[in-house]
Amino acid sequence: MAASLDGFIARKDGRVDWLETSDEFADGDTPDPGFVETFLKTIDCYVMGSRTYETASSFEARGFGWSYGDKPTFVLTSRDLPRTRDTVEFYSGDLVQFVNGRLRPRFRAIWFVGGGVVSGECLRLGLADEVRYSILPIVIGHGIPFFERLDRDIPLHLAEVKAYKSGMVELCYEVRGHRGEPRNATCQQQVRRMAQVSVLHSVGVHLTRS
């Protein structure tokens, strides 16, 4: 998930016009489009909130395409939203039951792509194994925070840092267990394979099936 330096994923009204922000960092890496495409094929399904879904749908309506391919996409919402694709399904029940009872048995790599409420709930409920966070070189002052509704501290382990020529920095954190160790023993190896995801395809909270 891409965010401003001050931790916002969108403006208060949902606009993300600042996502095209870039700078010049001579020592940074250049994203490999081929690697991004290969990486996206490893994702089994996406989970998102209604605001993220509406933003993605608006991008598609303006000719930018659907960012999530033909992968199953689950939208967490209690609102009556238009279903624009056959791969989209809406859900409004208990999140823990949905993830553990329905998604984990079917999918190995489950990616929560926002927004702030969904990402925060995923962490708060102990569902996440990994958090990926792409920081753009801009401060917007106000907006929708990366994580909302957190009621406790969540200890993390920094597994990977990647800086790009555009000035974007990508961070990957493993979510630690109750004793401080990373919850996913194979996460370090996975992180190295997934280090070059570009900002257009950055995703937030990652779950893996045991």
Where would I find each of the regions flagged by the language model?
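Enzymes that bind and transform nitrogen-containing heteroaromatic metabolites
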Residues: M1-L207
